[in-house]
């Protein structure tokens, strides 16, 4: 077992999710190989089954999560298998998406299945996708007492 490579891949997946949630698109793109293939199908969205290439994936995320949309992605239970300069990984994902403009909260869980490639000593995601366990969409008006008290992406309120 290559413990160093496994830890590097674990850090890579966490960086992928952190840069996604913080909308750091250049850093997000840097977690992906140039020829990455990503599948982000969702029952609540009308998404193409796959995106091909680093720029296509980053552009999709940049557009889909623009404005004041809030996301939190947490990946746990990693199962990483390293074979030289390639690896596979499975992760449990729990995610929350808040869409204030539409008074919606999406909550879900899925299992990610990734492949990784080490190029010039740097691990990147070569393929990524997930299979949903569940996804629930709630209107915030149906949540008694729901108040969004902080949103990093909201326009400042006029004084």
Predicted features along the sequence, with ranges:
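Short, low-complexity N-terminal intrinsically disordered segments enriched in polar/charged residues
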Residues: 1-34
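A structural signal for alpha-helical segments
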Residues: 1-4, 45, 52, 104
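Short, intrinsically disordered low-complexity segments
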Residues: 9-17, 53, 117, 123
């Amino acid at each position: 077992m290559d413990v160093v490579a496994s830890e590097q891949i674990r850090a890579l997946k966490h960086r992928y999710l952190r840069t996604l949630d913080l909308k750091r698109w250049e850093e997000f793109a840097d977690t992906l190989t140039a020829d990455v293939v990503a599948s982000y199908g969702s029952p609540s969205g009308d998404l193409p089954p796959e995106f091909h290439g680093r720029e296509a994936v980053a552009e999709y995320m940049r557009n889909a999560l623009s404005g004041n949309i809030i996301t939190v992605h947490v990946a746990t239970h990693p199962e990483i298998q390293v074979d030289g300069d390639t690896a596979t990984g499975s992760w449990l994902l729990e995610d929350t998406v808040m869409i204030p403009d539409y008074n919606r909260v999406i909550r879900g869980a899925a299992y990610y299945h990734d492949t990784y490639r080490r190029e010039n000593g740097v691990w990147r995601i070569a393929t990524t996708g997930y299979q949903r366990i569940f996804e629930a969409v709630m209107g915030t008006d149906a949540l008694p007492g729901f108040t969004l008290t902080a949103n990093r992406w909201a326009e400042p309120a006029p004084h």
